[in-house]
Structures are given as structure tokens and as C-alpha cells.
């Protein structure tokens, strides 16, 4: 009798994706983040579902309902902080996953990469809308500032902003629709992740060397299932440590003050995972220019495959490109730091220089260096 997992219409899909999937024998722990992102998404959907059972999306009661969840609901504080810090873990895994893709040339799988960029945008949109829901000071003013950026779009800008707000300011209509979108988007993300995997399994995984691994494949189970479980355990260890010991470490104290349209906080800033993009936005004195730079800072990832000039796929054997990659990482960390600082000297000029370097590295310096490396090897 044939094995059921290989013949059953549903089981054979699972089998070909997670059990008998041929995988390269040399993929390192940098390949764990895909499964970790899946786990993060499941954690976020489950905790979010239980939060939605107690949350009310009304400006008068939203803040109180979050307080009620933390004080009166059984383990409500745990669910709330798992959800808030789960978002931070999600973004840490996302950034490492994208960084891995850039380093090892995984972006050469165009469809997989472009759906990944789309996923990044979707997760960022979801996180932004989720941050508005507790209706604290930073929620309200963050929503006001970021949605207001759309008014920089010529001709239709101001109409577009009022359409998104559902009125003339961020109010009840805005909060209600943000809650609706925040609820639906994770399911769209899950569907997109399925398509992401579908395209990945068409080509098979890349590996650290960037060479074809067709000659040396091993089954996904048990090798990489065990490896993924180790990653998941480490993720859960870090997440629970964060939630149980310092749940507010990555949050903003201003969000414990209920939203007040008449009182602007001294420093409006988004969550830590948006600070790099926020720094790029602020470094350009022109509103429309800032918005374009903000969008391009993420959209530039879609251009990376077309800027690949090296004859080698991975950076494993390219020391100069490696050096530039780590400069890019340092630059992004600098931007993240600047995004959280007030707009004053010397932070303004540091932010502007870091923003210029970010775009220069990706668009100019790295492609030219790759050509230089080809030349060194007489390719």
C-alpha cells in the first residue's frame, strides 16, 4: 500500500512542502528565519484574535478596553504583551531574513523576492495600524503625522487624506477602519506567504555558496524540521524573556497617556522598527521629497536584482562586497538611532549623511564594486 502522505490530496501538498522537500545540504542558520516568520505570524494571529474579543474600536473606550485587558482579563496582560513584543520579534526576523537574501543573492529568484517585498510592505502597514489601536498619545499623533504625509501627493493629496481619515481629523471613523484593516491584513499576509513558498519551491532554496545544489540534496524532514524547532525554541525563549521581564522595553511611555488632540507630545516617533525609514523621511527638508525617499527606502529592494553586476551570486567569496554589506548594516543602525533623536544639531546632518550613504551604497557603490571584483578574477 502506498504511503498516505504521498497520495492523499491534502497530505501530499504538506509532504512535498515540509517532509520530502529536497533541500540543499549546506544551508546555515540564516535559513531558519522563514520558518520563524511563520511562527511569528501564527503567534500574532492567535494573540490578536483573543485581544479582538475584548477590544473596542471606539475613541471613547479604546484606551480603557486595553487597560481592561491588562487588568481584568485572565492573562490579558500576557496576551497583550506577547502581541506587542511579538511584532518586534517579527520585524527582527524580517530584517535578518531580508539581510540574508541580500548577502547570499537570494534575490535572483525574482518572483519569490518580489512577493517578499510585497509582504514587507503589508507587514509594515499592519504594524502601523496596530500601533494606532491602543489610542494613546503616540498612537494618535503617529497616525496623524504618517497619514498626513499623503497630503504631499500633488492635486489629490488633501482629498486622499480626508478620505482615509473619514473626516477632517484622525477620529472614530479612522480608528474603526484601522481596526478592520489590522484584523484582515494578517490573513492576506498568510496567503501571500503561501504564494511566496509556492514560488520558492519551484526553484528550490539558495545556499551560502550561491552555487547550484542540485547534485547534493537532503530531505527537509528530519534534518531541517529539527533545525527549525531549535530556532523556534530560541525565538520563544527571547520573546517570553522580553514579555515577562521587560515588556515595555521597546514601547513608548507616551502611549500610556490617553490620546489628546489638544496636546502634542514633544517628540513624535514611531516604533523602533520604523525609525530607519522615519530618519530618511526627516532628512529631506521637502515634504514630497521626504515621502518619496521614505517609499523608495523599502521599494529599492525590488531594484536590487537588476543592480546585481557580479558573476557570482553570493557574497561568500567576495570580501569587498562583504565589507560594503556590513557598512550598509551599520548605516541602517545609525539611521535607526537618528530616527529616535530630536531634530537638532548634530542629529540632522548625521541623518542626512546616513540617508545619502544608504542610497549610494545600494544604487552605485555596491554594483561598481561587484564589477571591480569580476575584473580582479579576470571574468
Swiss-Prot record:
Q: Where in the cell does this protein reside? A: Mitochondrion inner membrane
Tell me which cofactor or cofactors this protein depends on. heme b
Listed under subunit, the entry gives:
The cytochrome bc1 complex contains 11 subunits: 3 respiratory subunits (MT-CYB, CYC1 and UQCRFS1), 2 core proteins (UQCRC1 and UQCRC2) and 6 low-molecular weight proteins (UQCRH/QCR6, UQCRB/QCR7, UQCRQ/QCR8, UQCR10/QCR9, UQCR11/QCR10 and a cleavage product of UQCRFS1). This cytochrome bc1 complex then forms a dimer.
Q: What's a single GO BP term from this record?
A: mitochondrial electron transport, ubiquinol to cytochrome c
Q: Which InterPro entries match?
A: Cyt_b/b6_C (IPR005798), Cyt_b/b6_C_sf (IPR036150), Cyt_b/b6_N (IPR005797), Cytb/b6-like_sf (IPR027387), Cytochrome_b (IPR030689), Cytochrome_b_C_euk/bac (IPR048260), Cytochrome_b_N_euk/bac (IPR048259), Di-haem_cyt_TM (IPR016174)
Task: Please identify the protein, giving its name as recorded.
Answer: Cytochrome b
Question: Would you name any one GO CC term?
Answer: mitochondrial inner membrane
